[in-house]
Curated annotation (Swiss-Prot):
Annotated localization: Secreted
Purpose: Has antibiotic, anti-fungi and antiviral activity.
Protein name as it appears in the record: Neutrophil cationic peptide 1 type B
InterPro entries xref list: Alpha-defensin, Alpha-defensin_C, Alpha-defensin_N, Beta/alpha-defensin_C
Leader sequence segment: 1-19
Any single GO CC term annotated in Swiss-Prot or TrEMBL for this entry: extracellular matrix
Keyword rRNA-binding: no
Entry keyword annotation includes Transcription: no
Propiece residues: 20-62
Species in which this protein is naturally found: Cavia porcellus (Guinea pig)
Top-level taxonomic group: Eukaryota
Tissue: Bone marrow.
Intrachain disulfide bonds: C65-C93, C67-C82, C72-C92
Keywords from the named record: Antibiotic, Antimicrobial, Antiviral defense, Defensin, Disulfide bond, Fungicide, Secreted, Signal
Amino acid sequence: MRTVPLFAACLLLTLMAQAEPLPRAADHSDTKMKGDREDHVAVISFWEEESTSLQDAGAGAGRRCICTTRTCRFPYRRLGTCIFQNRVYTFCC
């Protein structure tokens, strides 16, 4: 049960680190707006404690997960969705 809050905190920190700072008023008039067709990817890594069933079953020590606008590619599998700044992303592990 401690894994879910830890995972949520890692996800939040990753998404906050990738967020762009707000432009200043002077910078806003000089820059062009980017299109919405960019592929956004967030990489998240989390590890289970040694005593969990994943470790007992012989699974790897860590799992790497991403939130992407595309479909999951091998070896990742879709496990759900990520929502950031009112956009829905595919959550792949």
